[in-house]
Amino acid sequence: WKTGDVLLLNGKIYTGRDAAHKRMVDMLNKGEKLPVDFTDKIIYYVGPVDPVRDEVVGPAGPTTATRMDKFTRQMLEQTGLLGMIGKSERGEAACQAIADNKAVYLMAVGGSAYLVAKAIKEAKVVAFPELGMEAIYEFEVKDMPVTVAVDSSGLSVHAVAPKQWQAKIGIKILDRKSVV
């Protein structure tokens, strides 16, 4: 996968936000076994809302990935994690950790929590239920739309896309003072 590629994910992914990451890193630091095997898996930075009626989960939009940057290298190196899904750009250290571990960071579209939830076909809590919506869930997804935001070489769409878009549409980015 290359930066900017649009993918439809299918299969099992796990969830985890700030509280779950903190707990997992604390466990790793103590030499404890994690309750989930993340080898070659993807973790989605999300805290799903409770389902209503026939929903599997309620709205399940991505959370800001930069909050997990401080956990990224350790999670990749000690768990065998393949990749992460979130929204927003990643910091330089996280991009380097992704490159060093030949991992990937995918972006789900922020603001589309309801649409993302429709791709989730099954959901169950697999660890840390006391964390509520920040518990670790296992999702079975079908055709979950994501964009490769940082590829396995560490190249970030946030670094390259603005220049590519400018070249394609042939305009310069204007400030408010120059807009007529």
Where does each model-flagged region fall?
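Short, charged beta-turn/beta-strand-edge "cap" motif at the junction between a beta-strand
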Residues: 6, 12-16, 152
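Pocket-edge structural micro-motifs
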Residues: 11, 46-48, 150
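Feature captures the catalytic cores and cofactor-binding loops of soluble hydro-lyases/lyases
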Residues: 15-144
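C-terminal binding/interaction regions
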Residues: 118-176
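Conserved small/polar residues in nucleotide/adenosyl-binding loops
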Residues: 179-180
